[in-house]
Amino acid sequence: MGKITFYEDRGFQGRHYECSTDHSNLQPYFSRCNSVRVDSGCWMLYEQPNFTGCQYFLRRGDYPDYQQWMGFSDSVRSCRLIPHAGSHRIRLYEREDYRGQMVEFTEDCPSLQDRFHFNEIYSLNVLEGCWVLYEMTNYRGRQYLLRPGEYRRYHDWGAMNARVGSLRRVMDFY
């Protein structure tokens, strides 16, 4: 079970809301979010309701302002607790519909360019565990939560383009 607390002001000040489950619409609980404390679990925050918009991956820890989670603004409108999995496996493809060169990962990868020799992924298949895909190397840029399943095109995971720089397993549950 996870626990996250959202604060309207920086430095864990102002009105706050404590959460332990997925929420598709946080707007009734606070108008802005400038700091977050994750007591347990791994969470994906979304800028828009219904798990849409920019995504931000947070694990246990304190985030005294939204820049700490690489946020572009103080807008957090939905959140999802990411389930813990024991093993992780993902396949990435250079073309849509699982065509072209394929590479499989079971560990984090800070630079797809170094391992895969290109930085555009058009389809993927998450076989085990949850992953976070990052637009840039070294776990920077836009983030996308990938749960087990098939993603035939980059639009399926919410991306505007096929650029992928790095990927990380979701592991820190406690």
UniProtKB/Swiss-Prot annotation:
PROSITE patterns listed in its UniProt record: CRYSTALLIN_BETA_GAMMA
GO molecular function list: structural constituent of eye lens
UniProt xrefs under Pfam families: Crystall
Region described as Connecting peptide: 84-87
SUPFAM superfamilies according to UniProt: gamma-Crystallin-like
InterPro entries: Beta/Gamma-Crystallin, Beta/gamma_crystallin, G_crystallin-like
Tissue: Detected in the superior olivary complex and fibers of the ventral aoustic stria of the auditory hindbrain.
Domain Beta/gamma crystallin 'Greek key': 2-40, 41-83, 88-128, 129-171
Record keywords, A-Z: Eye lens protein, Repeat
GO BP field: cellular response to reactive oxygen species; eye development; lens development in camera-type eye; lens fiber cell differentiation; response to peptide hormone; visual perception
Keyword Repeat listed: yes
GO annotation, cellular component aspect: cytoplasm; nucleus
Entry domain remark: Has a two-domain beta-structure, folded into four very similar Greek key motifs.
Known function: Crystallins are the dominant structural components of the vertebrate eye lens.
More details: There are six different gamma crystallins identified in rat lens.
Entry's family note: Belongs to the beta/gamma-crystallin family.
Protein's name in the database: Gamma-crystallin D
Organism name: Rattus norvegicus
